[in-house]
């Protein structure tokens, strides 16, 4: 059996999942990558090639016939070629009593004195014990392979990160990487599919099996579909033979579920205060009917600003960046949609922030202290981040912060919904809101923005930004639809 460094990545990305690794090993087809995922793959190759261009003359092993790449790599190392691109290593060993062939393909081998540095190029901005463990394990496996084949350790292991910096990765002799490969081997040797709980943030993060796994979980009424049942709790319940919401409700009262310990990090933790809510979610998932807990607490105003941001995560941009600040007043005196967009030049981020402050100030001038209604904490967090980044000279951002109304906790305190997630996209569909765009979503919008940034065609850029603006405008309309639905409860 062949085990590769890519198997470790499959185990971790987009989120940790042993079932994905198993299905890939079984040859089960995945859905096509999203537009965003395809763009990120392209950007990753561009990032890698740009770094390669800084390294001088190199030998490209990927141009060699596949069955000759391992021997060509070793010969090139022996000949002390300055830079070896896309090297390939293979080494037969025994892991957990099984004979396996371990394969690794580091991006760069860079001669430094008499020894080689092993370096991989990644878009990730941070690589350490707390960020992207799989990258460190990948490099450690390359280091172990190099040592077995060459006979001496590599000079160092490094990552060329998304910031352009080069970070060192500690080498432990390959112990951690080989231990992880033992986990990989155990999954690949399974004769039946391993149990994996589904989860909204886990499975909707870009996994190619989400449609397959979600449909199967719904068909078997898996307990992991119950809101607030985290991955550790789902695994614990499943191992105890409790696999459905019905079994959960019939097996536990609040106190007993509260006392149940489930895996949590390296140890265990009681379910605790979440037990009551979990049982409520289980009950409504069985009945399919929502449950009113308390009056909906929304402050009375004539008008409300629906407020939504579109941003790029730090792994895809030099800084975590909001590229669109969307606002629209609804109520007795509605406004047109307002989209404050960051510029495409070097100072575009600041331009977008200033445009938002100007637009928000105009709203306050016309409407007074009007609530800015949003969904979840993204807006509050990022306003605070931008105040630290660029300041708030006239106090407009501080005023927005004072007037923020997060509709998510308002909803959760008032109503238990028979849904697997309180994501706005899920709740808006539940209340009957319909969108007009065939394609939409945060990842889709990021893909459009990246394409708009990369193109020199002004017409194409404007068309893509127009689609993003339309998506954001419908996000605001969806928030208002949920808001109105809540007020009628």
Regions found by a protein language model. Name each.
Residues 48, 52, 56, 143, ...:
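Short, amphipathic alpha-helical segments that act as regulatory/interfacial helices
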Residues 112, 116-118, 122-124, 297-479, ...:
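Structural signature of nuclease core domains in nucleic-acid processing machines
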Residues 126-133, 145-218, 363-366, 386-402, ...:
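Metal-dependent nuclease catalytic regions and adjoining charged, substrate-binding loops involved
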């Amino acid at each position: 059996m062949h085990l590769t460094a890519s198997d470790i990545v499959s185990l971790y990305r987009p989120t940790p999942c042993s079932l994905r690794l198993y299905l890939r090993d079984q040859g089960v087809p995945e859905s096509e990558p999203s537009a965003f995922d395809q763009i990120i793959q392209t950007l990753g190759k561009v990032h890698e090639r740009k770094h390669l261009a800084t390294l001088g003359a190199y030998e490209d092993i990927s141009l060699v016939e596949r069955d000759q790449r391992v021997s060509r790599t070793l010969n090139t190392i022996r000949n002390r070629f300055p830079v070896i691109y896309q090297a390939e290593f293979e080494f037969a060993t025994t892991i957990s009593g099984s004979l396996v062939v371990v394969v690794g393909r580091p991006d760069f081998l860079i001669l430094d004195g008499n020894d080689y540095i092993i370096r991989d190029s990644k878009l990730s901005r941070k690589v350490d014990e707390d960020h992207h463990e799989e990258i460190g394990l990948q490099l450690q496996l390359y280091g172990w392979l190099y040592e077995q084949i060459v006979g001496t350790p590599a000079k160092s292991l490094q990552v060329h990160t998304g910031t352009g910096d080069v970070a060192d990765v500690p080498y432990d002799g390959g112990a951690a990487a080989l231990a992880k490969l033992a986990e990989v081997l155990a999954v690949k040797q399974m004769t039946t599919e391993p149990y994996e709980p589904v989860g909204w943030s886990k499975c909707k993060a870009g996994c190619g099996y989400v449609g397959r796994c979600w449909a199967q979980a719904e068909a078997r009424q898996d307990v992991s579909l119950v809101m607030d049942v985290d991955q550790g709790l789902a695994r614990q319940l499943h191992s105890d033979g409790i696999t459905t919401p019905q079994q959960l409700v019939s097996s536990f009262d609040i106190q007993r579920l509260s006392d149940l310990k489930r895996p949590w990090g390296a140890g265990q933790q009681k379910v605790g205060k979440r037990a009551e809510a979990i049982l409520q979610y289980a009950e409504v998932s069985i009945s399919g009917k929502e449950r009113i807990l308390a009056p909906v607490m929304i402050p009375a105003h004539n008008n409300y600003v629906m407020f939504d941001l579109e941003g790029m995560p730090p792994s895809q941009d030099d800084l975590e960046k909001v590229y669109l600040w969307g606002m629209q007043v609804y109520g007795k005196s509605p406004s047109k949609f307002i989209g404050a967009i960051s510029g495409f030049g070097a100072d575009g981020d600041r331009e977008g922030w200033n445009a938002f402050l100007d637009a928000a100030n105009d709203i306050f001038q016309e409407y007074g202290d009007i609530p800015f209604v949003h969904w979840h904490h993204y807006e509050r967090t990022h306003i605070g981040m931008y105040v630290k980044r660029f300041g708030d000279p006239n106090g407009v951002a501080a005023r927005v912060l004072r007037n923020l109304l997060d509709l998510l906790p308002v909803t959760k305190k008032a109503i238990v919904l028979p849904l697997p997630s309180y994501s706005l996209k899920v709740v808006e569909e539940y209340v009957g809101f319909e969108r007009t765009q065939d394609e939409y979503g945060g990842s889709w919008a990021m893909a459009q923005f990246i394409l708009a940034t990369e193109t020199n065609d002004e017409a194409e850029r404007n068309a893509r930004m127009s689609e993003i603006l339309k998506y954001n405008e419908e996000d605001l309309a969806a928030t208002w639809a949920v808001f109105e639905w809540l007020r009628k409860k």
